[in-house]
Structure formats: C-alpha cells, structure tokens
C-alpha cells in the first residue's frame, strides 16, 4: 500500500523550496489588492504538516510580497523615501495583515524552516535595514528570516522577481540609496517615481481598473479609461517630470532608456512591457541553472529547453 503522505521524489529530496510571488498585500481597506491574509496563512501552515514535515522547507516570497509602492503615508505618496517613511509604510501593512505574520511565526516554530523575502518593484523598501529589523521582530525569528536582495539561489535553482530585467523598475543592486542633504533616500527607479506622481493620485477613483485583465481588452471596452491615463502621464512626462529635473530633484533622472520607453509607450499606448524575450535569451544563453523561477509578469508561463 502506498503511503498517501509520500511525496514524489521525497526519498531523494532533502529540502522543499516553495516560491510565491506578487502577493502585493497593502495597508488594508478597499485599496488593498490582497484581502486574503487568513487564507494565505492557513495555506502556509500546511508546510508544517504531513507530508512536508519530513523535509526542511524554504518559503521564498519572490518579490512584491508587500505593496509598499501603493501604501500612502498621511494620505500622500512621497518619492523621497527615508528609513522612517519606509518603516511607517511597513507598519501599516503589518497591522493590516497580522494573520500572515502569525502564520510565519507558527511555521518557523516547527524548526527546519526558513523564510526569504526577495525584493520586487513594489517593495524596494526592503533594502532598508530598519525595515528588515521590523519584519524580523514581528515574525519573532531573527535567525530564520533572510533578505537575499533581488535574487537568490538554492542549489541549481535561481529565484528572481524579474523586475531587474524591466528598464522601468531596475535598481542598481550595489547602489540602492541616494545621499541628499544628509539624508539617505531610496533610489527609486524612474518607473516607480512616475507611478507615484502620476498614477497614485488617481487610485482612489480608479483602483478597480487595476484589477481588470487583460489590460488590452479593458482599454478597448473602456476607451475613456485609456484617455484618462494617457492624459495624466502625458502631462506628467511633458511638464511635471521636466520641472523636477530643472529643480534637480535627487530621485529624478533622464537617460536614453527612459526616453525610449516613454516614446514607445505613448506611441503604442501600451502601458505594459513583455519581458518574455529577455528571459528566453537568458535561458538559452546559460545552462548554469536547471530551474529559474520568475515573478513580476502576473501571468502563468512555463518554458523549457
């Protein structure tokens, strides 16, 4: 008789790696895209029960676990993000999703479990040591909670969020901060700056639209929505962003990549970018990794070579 709790390949396995990306839990309320913390907590607790209890388990939250990008402070969305601002944002999310953090604490209590938070474009504030300390304190397991950066590897598996391949959201891994007038600021990529200044003021009225897919069909059926967004970003790029450059705003920059992407998006009226080709080329170029897990796309895909 076969043990119904036996996992395929379990006799050879020494560790189970669970990768989850793009949860995007926010600060609660109608604007939060993830009101399911209790469900997620119950799901995660299963990795402390049979048949997984026989294995060491790594829970890898592969970027955009927290929607810090769309979390406001005092009703505003600052682009000059200090450690204090980042911590205040994270505290709002922790308060709204206690069930998630309680579940992580319970899982780590079992032993032979580790939790990793990879950085994504919605939670770049995770680079702040102060935010990392806050999360470790809330989960109450300092030595089992890790922050590997924008990617991590386990054996011959590479886990990366994927936003580092997106020119809108790429952050220099070795220079995630800016120094300005004695303050340490988060080096926000230009795509994040644009969303904070042009899109987030519309969130209260248009939050529902961000949850509709596929985007192309949504714009075909709701041309007024496309017009509102295009006009908002046109005004931003041709007036507000230029003003910031002239005023030497430290978080604003201009380069050929920015110019090219803005021209493309207005010319095609396509707000999204397909990065499939980039990852296909990486897979074909190197066989260093047997498995590569990528988030960011919000679309289920499977490639093999």
Residue ranges and their predicted role:
Residues 1-305:
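Extended recognition/assembly regions associated with phosphoester-bond processing machinery
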């Amino acid at each position: 008789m076969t043990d119904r709790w036996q996992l395929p390949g379990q006799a050879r396995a020494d560790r189970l790696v669970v990768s989850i990306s793009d949860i995007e839990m926010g600060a609660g309320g109608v604007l939060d895209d993830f009101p399911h913390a209790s469900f997620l907590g119950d799901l995660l607790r299963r990795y402390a029960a049979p048949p997984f209890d026989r294995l060491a388990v790594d829970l890898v939250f592969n970027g955009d676990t927290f929607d810090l990008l769309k979390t406001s402070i005092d009703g505003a969305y600052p682009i000059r993000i200090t450690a204090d601002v980042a911590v205040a944002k994270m505290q709002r999310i922790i308060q709204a999703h206690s069930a998630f953090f309680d579940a992580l604490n319970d899982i780590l209590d079992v032993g032979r479990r580790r939790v990793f938070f990879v950085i994504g474009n919605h939670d770049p504030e995770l680079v702040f040591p102060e935010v990392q300390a806050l999360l470790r304190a809330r989960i109450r397991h300092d030595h089992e909670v890790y922050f590997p950066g924008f990617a991590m590897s386990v054996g011959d598996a590479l886990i990366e969020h994927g936003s580092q391949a997106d020119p809108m959201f790429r952050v220099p891994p070795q220079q995630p901060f800016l120094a300005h007038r004695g303050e340490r600021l988060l080096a926000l990529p230009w795509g994040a700056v644009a969303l904070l200044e042009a899109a987030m003021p519309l969130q209260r009225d248009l939050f529902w639209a961000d949850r509709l897919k596929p985007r192309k069909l949504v714009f075909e059926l709701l041309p007024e929505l496309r017009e509102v967004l295009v006009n908002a970003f046109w005004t931003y790029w041709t007036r507000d962003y230029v003003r910031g450059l002239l005023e030497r705003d430290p978080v604003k920059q201009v380069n050929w990549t920015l110019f090219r992407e803005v021209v493309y998006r207005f010319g095609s009226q396509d707000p999204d970018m397909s990065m499939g080709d980039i990852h296909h080329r990486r897979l074909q170029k190197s066989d260093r990794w047997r498995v590569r897990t990528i988030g960011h796309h919000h679309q289920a895909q499977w490639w093999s070579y």
